[in-house]
Regions:
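Core dinuclear metal-dependent hydrolase active-site scaffold
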Residues: 291-373, 442-443, 447-525, 599-618
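Compositionally biased P/S/T/G-rich terminal and signal peptide-adjacent segments
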Residues: 50-70, 190-226, 282-293
Length: 618
């Protein structure tokens, strides 16, 4: 069984801080002890072929009797590997003896020697490691004596940090320097520790019949467990295991042979998905609240006809064109509105005014005052200032309306902090306001919603189906926030039962577009596409963007870009597949253009009936 894990940029720095703590002293020169941890000691030791000795002689005099082993497949930056290195370093500092350090590779057809004395760190392919791994939960770490092996393992990065602290404390207690002979002997009874470092993932049953790829922090208090090389049957068995643990099924969804389910208890909500194309399962667990459960389809009172409006955002600020940005407004059948992004921070007041004028005009037949206008959802695709800047800077202008929900799903704080200085794009402080999104939602009196892949939210008679969130990309990390941009589609059904589909791609990169193309295939077919990232660069994977567009084959293109920049991005060949002979459905293309421009189409839309308002650039 092979395992791979998320390589956090900050892991090395955090581990060094832990190591400083381990070898540090207090002001009096006395040794400091590791912090108290939540831990449990099993009543019995698992049965093994080689009974564990009562004690383990690690070092005697100048001789070491153990070798430290780490997984061969993990690179030197992985926290399991750095933990192995730090254990070796710590033992040498305390005893003067440097233990051997190697990996778990052996010739095919051979087996590891059960009689060899070894410290196994991380997900090695030793049976002793597998025994320990199968006996603990995803939120745990373990230090266990199994036969002649000492096994140290965790499913999470923080678990390795805790295990390193605990094992170092055990080592301190096993050092004897009396009689002039340095020795390190560890009692077996001390090597039977399980600690819980993450309560939610520790509560989950283990997944069988698959390979664990990652237990990754997904931000917003959620964790994502990724299982590869699995099957639909194993996925269904896991749902049954969740049910046996008390989880209730809230809803399920199927798209292109991919299966999704939302389950919950009074403590946690789980969103699980089986991905047919990649034979993967992704399990996202988060604290339970009613807001984690997607809205089901219900009967609504028909108040008006659905519309979709794109608002232009280009403007001159300090002599520079703003060019990009995204602002879409849905008017739904029940008379409520959904705003997607909103526009720049630099001219947020103007963008907010344009949004407000649009929703007032479109609701004048049924809303007598601003207090009667409902913004059922404000969806933030990602936290770049040309998309959610208006939301951050001008949200106070919307307190006069009833804002019910804010949707967002961003990187967690730790990952963001690690990337701020990774590239010029992430200059310190440039995008730190993204973390204000839940706070602003609260100020608007709105519920804060974190959507997940496969979820369907029914809002005002329209189906909002999420196809990509950052959890689709985990455990990989990326130095561009565009890779965490939401991708979703909306489906509006007319009275005859015909569906009309709009694809909203936000600032999706070529990598995210590749993921949805590989995952959903021909199911990406739609009627309208909002071009990804303004039709601009794909962050190094133009083929992924083109592949997705070839599957979408829309009739109508909404291009969220200013006229100045359009002359550049229209030359990018991956966009051509949307409107050249490779797309026989193409009929209409609309450029967002100058600030205040609008193009409005009905949903469903009849070609040639768009309502356009064009503001002349001053």
């Amino acid at each position: 069984m092979k395992f791979k894990y998320k390589n956090l940029i900050l892991a090395a720095a955090r581990l060094l801080a832990v190591c400083a703590l381990l070898s540090g002293c207090d002001g009096s020169g006395a040794e400091t002890t590791a912090p108290e941890m939540l831990e449990t000691v099993p009543e019995t030791t698992p049965e093994t072929q080689a009974p564990a000795p009562s004690e383990y002689n690690i070092v005697s005099g100048k001789e070491g009797f153990f070798k430290i082993v780490r997984p061969e497949e993990l690179d030197s930056t992985h926290i399991a590997v750095t933990t192995a290195v730090e254990i070796r370093k710590f033992i040498k500092e305390r005893t003067g003896v440097s233990l051997g350090l190697g990996d778990d590779w052996i010739m095919p057809g051979t087996e590891h020697d059960p009689e060899a004395f070894e410290i196994l760190v991380g997900p090695t392919d030793y049976k002793e490691s597998l025994e320990v791994m199968s006996s603990i939960s995803y939120g745990d770490y373990a230090i266990r004596a199994v036969g002649n092996k000492i096994v140290i393992f965790s499913y999470t990065d923080v678990g390795y940090e805790e295990a390193l602290q605990k094992f170092s404390t055990i080592i301190r207690g096993g050092i004897d320097n009396s009689g002039g002979n340095m020795s390190l002997t560890l009692a077996a009874e001390k090597l039977n520790v399980v600690g819980t470092v993450e309560k939610m993932t520790a509560s989950l049953p283990l997944y069988h019949d698959g390979k664990l790829t990652a237990v990754a922090n997904a931000g917003d208090g959620a964790y994502c467990i990724v299982i590869s090389d699995t099957t639909e049957a194993a996925y269904n068995s896991y749902l049954s295991a969740l049910a046996a643990d008390g989880y209730k099924t809230h809803c399920t969804n199927e798209l292109a042979e991919n299966l999704f389910a939302t389950l919950y208890t009074s403590e946690y909500t789980v969103n699980a998905g089986f991905y047919k194309n990649s034979d993967e399962v992704r399990i996202v667990i988060e604290p339970f609240s009613e807001d984690t459960l997607p809205l089901a389809k219900t009967e609504i009172k028909s108040v008006t006809t659905p519309l979709l409006t794109m608002i232009g955002l280009d403007n001159l600020v300090s002599g520079e064109y703003q060019n990009n940005g995204l602002c879409l407004i849905y008017r739904l059948e029940d008379g409520s509105f959904v705003i997607v992004d909103g526009g720049h921070s630099e001219d947020a007041t103007v963008s907010a005014t344009d949004i407000i004028n649009t929703i007032r005009e479109q609701s004048k037949d049924y809303a007598k005052s601003d207090s009667e206008i409902r913004i059922a959802a404000w969806i933030i695709t990602h936290p770049h200032s040309d998309h959610f800047g208006t939301f951050v800077k001008a949200y106070s202008q919307f307190t006069k309306f009833k804002v019910e929900r804010v949707f967002a799903n961003f990187w967690d704080e730790a990952t963001f902090e690690g990337f701020k200085s990774a590239k010029d794009t992430f200059a310190p402080g440039k995008y730190t306001t993204y973390s204000q999104t839940p706070t602003i939602a609260a100020k608007l009196g709105a519920k804060y919603i974190v959507p997940h892949v496969g979820q369907v939210w029914w809002i005002g008679g329209t189906k909002f189906e999420f196809l990509y969130t950052l959890e689709s990309f985990l455990p990989r990390t990326t130095p561009t926030f565009n890779t965490c941009s939401l991708i979703f589609r909306t489906v509006t059904t007319d009275k005859s039962g015909k569906d009309y589909t709009v694809m909203v791609t936000g600032d999706g990169t070529g990598y995210t577009m590749q993921i949805i193309a590989d995952t959903f295939g021909k199911a990406l077919k739609c009627d309208v596409v909002q071009l990804a990232h303004h039709g601009s660069i794909t962050s190094g994977n133009s083929g992924g963007t083109q592949k997705a567009y070839e599957l979408m084959k829309p009739s109508v293109l909404l291009w969220p870009v200013g006229d100045q920049h359009y002359s550049t991005v229209k030359e990018y060949t991956y966009n051509h597949v949307l409107y050249d002979s490779r797309n026989p459905n193409f009929a209409e293309l609309y450029i967002a253009g100058w600030q205040g421009n609008t193009v409005t189409i009905s949903l469903p839309y009849t070609l040639g009936t768009a309502d356009r308002k064009v503001v002349v650039e001053p």
